[in-house]
């Protein structure tokens, strides 16, 4: 249906028969992103990569590079997965990474990290769940 290869760089030509998803309902494809705070530069090891990584924005499920408002973020979850925070971050593709705004959570003033890898799934949790369900339905519909 779809491989969610989240938090890892995937070169555009890495798979011979699996391509990056082009929209929210494409099947037989993959999505990937690595999340960093907006306006931060990626670490040197990313800058040194000799390939263009696939980056799909989990708020639009495309590779368009425009800023996508947090209003499209249906909800992220905190580390205990016991509370959904709607509109938790915006997102924008930038130079082989996904930029996001600082999470809109209690205590965000103390959140100084630039690398949001720990939140690659949490920040977009509801969007990912709903997308997986939509892709499964699209896949099954195409099987008939």
Map each language-model feature to its residues.
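Surface cap/lid and interfacial helix-loop subdomains adjacent to catalytic sites
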Residues: 1-134, 138, 142
